[in-house]
Amino acid sequence: MSDGKKTKTTVNIYGQHFTIIGEESKAHMRHVAGVVDDKMREINEKNPYLDINKLAVLTAVNVVHDYMKLQEKYEILERQLKEKE
């Protein structure tokens, strides 16, 4: 959870080091980076001939797709809860 204080950490995503600054904990930022790294490797396994730029874009598209599906499910659950009130 964010407390307003900036945190800086270095992460490794797909063999590249990135410095990330945010309001979340270092553990959270490392976890996020790990999820991105895992997704990139998953996509690369299915199509090893993608260059790094295409791999990064496809990773972003996949992650946003997953996020949007979860958001839709959340909104449905919220509506169901309101209907029960």
UniProtKB/Swiss-Prot annotation:
SUPFAM superfamilies (alphabetical): Cell division protein ZapA-like
Entry keywords, A to Z: Cell cycle, Cell division, Coiled coil, Cytoplasm, Septation
GO BP: division septum assembly; FtsZ-dependent cytokinesis; septin ring assembly
Matches recorded under Pfam families: ZapA (PF05164)
Chief localization: cytoplasm
Gene3D superfamilies reported in the protein's UniProt record: 6.10.250.790
Transmembrane segments: none
Subunit architecture: Homodimer. Interacts with FtsZ.
Entry similarity comment: Belongs to the ZapA family. Type 2 subfamily.
Name under which the protein is recorded: Cell division protein ZapA
Species this protein is from: Bacillus velezensis (strain DSM 23117 / BGSC 10A6 / LMG 26770 / FZB42)
Lineage: Bacteria, Bacillati, Bacillota, Bacilli, Bacillales
Gene name linked to the record: zapA
